[in-house]
Amino acid sequence: ANNKIILDVSEGLLKLATNLRFTMGLPFDVNHTDPLAQASPLNDTSMFLNKQSGHRFLRLDLSHAGANNKQWQYHLGSANCESESADAAPEASCAFTNRVEFILPMTQLDSELALEISVSNILAQVDLLEADSCEFGSPEAQPCKQLLRNLLNRPWIKWD
């Protein structure tokens, strides 16, 4: 699991920082490279669909115990990528890059900061019992559209 963000920064520079800014996603040239040729964590094949679509940037695999263990997945990655086949990387950017940028205020001057993620805010207004899974489909289809809207506009990640 990729559960840490490691900052390579001096203590002095950290004290001057006012925000932590990062992007959930990968640059185009890295996203479509064979994971077996990449260093960890990008070599995790469970987070890679194929060369055409690239890596998953966020993966939620859920089940609902009260609904006959219905499985539901949300896999955020680039979508509508055009290439000769699924085994070929595209030559141009995908129609939907689906990279999500974060800017978190640095209010604590501590080298051991923890982030809290609210899955309920990511899934807000999505009926998991009725909605189809969202796995690299068109981001304009429901529930993909609502999930991406939640990632971009709802406070689902914050300092703990």
What label would you give each PLM region?
Residues 1-160:
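A short, solvent-exposed, low-complexity linear motif enriched for acidic/polar residues
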